[in-house]
Swiss-Prot record:
Its cofactor is Mg(2+). Keywords: Cytoplasm, Magnesium, Metal-binding, Nucleotidyltransferase, RNA-binding, Transferase. Belongs to the polyribonucleotide nucleotidyltransferase family. Its EC number is 2.7.7.8. The keyword Zinc does not apply. One of its GO terms (molecular function) is magnesium ion binding. The lineage of its organism: Bacteria, Bacillati, Cyanobacteriota, Cyanophyceae, Synechococcales. This is Polyribonucleotide nucleotidyltransferase. Residues 562-621 form the KH domain. The keyword Nucleus does not apply. It catalyses: RNA(n+1) + phosphate = RNA(n) + a ribonucleoside 5'-diphosphate.
Amino acid sequence: MPQLSKSLSFDGRDIRLELGLFAPQAGGSVLISSGDTAVLVAATRSTAREGIDFLPLTVDYEERMYAAGRIPGGFLRREGRPPERATLTSRLIDRPLRPLFPSWLRDDLQVVATTLSMDETVPPDVLAVTGASIATLVAKIPFYGPMAAVRVGLVGDDFIINPTYREIEKGDLDLVVAGTPAGVIMVEAGANQLPEADVIEAIDFGYEAVQELIKAQQSLLAELGIEQILPEAPNADNTLENFVRDRASSGVQQVLQHFSFTKSERDAALDEVKASVVEAIAALPEEDPVRSVTAAEPKALGNTFKALTKTLMRQQILRDGVRVDGRKLDQVRPISSQVGLLPPRVHGSGLFQRGLTQVLSIATLGTPGDAQELDDLHPDTQKRYLHHYNMPPYSVGETRPMRSPGRREIGHGALAERALLPVLPSKEEFPYVIRVVSEVLSSNGSTSMGSVCGSTLALMDAGVPIKKPVSGAAMGLIREGDEYRVLTDIQGIEDFLGDMDFKVAGTDQGITALQMDMKIHGLPLEIIADAINQAKPARLHILNKMLEAIATPRADLSTYAPRLFRIQINPEQIGLVIGPGGKTIRSITEQTGAKIDIEDTGAVTISAVDADSALRAKSIIEGMTRTITAGDVYIGKVTRIIPIGAFVEFLPGKEGMIHISQIADYRVARVEDELTVGDEVVVKVREIDQKGRVNLTRKGIDPEEVSAARAAVEAS
C-alpha cells in the first residue's frame, strides 16, 4: 500500500492519519492521532477454516505503558493481561464493527489497536474505533462501512465533541456514538440523571459529527484509489430452505402462538418440530439433493431451522403486534423483588426477578484501603465502587467448564456499575469502598439490567445512602424496511432473533446509563428516540415494584460492616502519625485493632469491626495531632518514672514529662514517694521546648481548670 499522510480539522482539533508507514504486512493499517495521543490500528484477513459457520472476528485493544512514559509495575515490569478498561475498549471497537461484515463471511479477521502515545486530554478509545474502520477499508475486507465514532460531553448547557478527561469528569454526560451512512449503529453512555430529550439531542449532535469523519474516510479511499465494492452474498442453494419451510412452517407457527409455553417448553416444542424435519430428511433417498446438503454440511439444517423460526417470529410481531409469550409490545414481564434474604454476615443483598431472569446481588462495605488500584493509562488511579457480574452455566440450564470472567462478564459488570455511579454518595458523605457482586441465577434476557435492579436493592439493604434508586430495562427492535416495532423488556429469543439490544437505566428523574448494540447497519434517530421514550414507563414500573420491597436505604449498617470515622489533620503531621518506618501507626493498630488510611491531603479514615476500637484509634490520633499550648490542663496517666521526674500520657499517644521540682509545692526527695506508674494525675502544660518536648507541672492548677479537664475527658 502506498504511504499517505493526511490531516483533517475536526471540531477545532487536528486528526492526523498515517497510512502505509507502519505494519507493512498487515492487510491494512493506520496510525490515527490527535494531540499527543496516537493509536496504531491494523486489520488482517486470512483464509476461512473448514467447518466454520460464523464470522471468526477478533478485536483486541492493547495499551503500552511507554505510551505515557511509564514502566509497568509488578515483578516482570512488563504488560500482562489487559486491564479492565482495555477490555472495555476492545468491546467498544468490536460492537459497531461486527454488524458491518457480511453475514456470509467466514474468513478469519483480526483487528488490533495499540496505543503508542497518550496525553491526558485525548482519550484513545474513539480514535481506535474510527481507526478500525479505516484499517478494514484499506485492507479491502468486505465491509459495509465507513464507520466512525465520537464522544459527546455535556458541560453546563453545552454539548462538546471529544471532550478531554477533565471535561468528562466535570460534565453530566459521557456518551460515545458510532455511526455509518445508514444511521447510528452503537451508543454507550453514562449520564447524571439526564432527561430523555437531552440524551436524544446528544445522540443527534454526535451523529452529525460522525458524518464528517465518514466523509473524510470516503475522501481518503478516493485519494488512495480504493474502490469500495459492497459485497453480495454468494449464490445459495435454496433446496434445503424450501424443504424446511414446507415441512416446518406450520409447526413453528403453532409453537410461537402457544403463548402459555415457558421457555423450556417452547424450546422443547421447537425441537420436536425440528426432529420431525430430520425424520423426513432421513426418509428421502440418499441421492436426494436435500439429503446431500445435510450430509455435506452437518450444521446446515440447524441454521436453516433457526432462520425460519426467526422469520416467522418477526412476521408475527410485525403483523399482529404480539410476542411469543403473549405480551404486548410495551409490556414488562412479571417482577419480584426481595431484600435481606442472606444471613447478616452479608452486609446487604437483593434478589430481583423479571420473568425467568433472576439476579442475586450482594453488597459489601470496605475501608478506603480496599479501593481498587488501577494500573493503566487512564488518569483515574482508583475505584471506590466496584460491580462484578457472574453468569454460571446453570443459569441457562447448561453444563460447561467454569472460567474466569470473560469480556461479556466484564462488559455487563461495567454497564451496571456505570448506571449506579451518579447516585452514590460522595466520599466525604460515605467514605466506604463499596463492592457489589451480581450472581445471575437464571437467564432469559436482560441480565445486565437485572443486575442494575439487584444492585440498587442490595445497596439500599446495606444502608448505603444512595441519592435515588435506579432501575433498567432492555429494549428490542424488529425492522423490515420502513416498518418496525420496538419491544419492551426483551427476553432471550427476542434478543437472539431481533435487530437491536438497547439497555436503558436510570432513576425517576432521568437516565444514568445507555448501551445500544445493532445487528443491522444503522438506525435513524427517530427509531432510537422511540426506544428511549418507550423505555421510560417500563423503567418507572420496574422501579415502583422494587420500592415495594424496600422504599429507602436502611438507617443502620450491618452489624458486621466496618465502622468508619474520618478526621482531618495537618498534612505536615502525617509523618508524626506514621512514625519512623511506620512504627507509630503500627502501634496504634496493634493497640486498638483498627485500620488506618491516611491520604496526602491529611484526611485520615479509621475503621474497625466495632465502633469502640475505631473511636479509640481516633482519640489517639486526635491527641497526637492536637495543637498544645502552654497553660492547657489535662487529666493524664503516669507511664514511666525516672530519677528526675515522671512521664505522663496526657492525650492518647502524647506524653510529657513532669520534672521532680514540678511534682508538688514542696520539696520531693524521690519521685516514687509521690507517684507510681498508672496513677491518674492532673497536669498543666508548662512549656513546649524548641525540640517539641512538652514539660508539665502539677503546680498552680485551679479547681475550675480541673473540672473543665474532667468534663473534656467524659465528653470524649
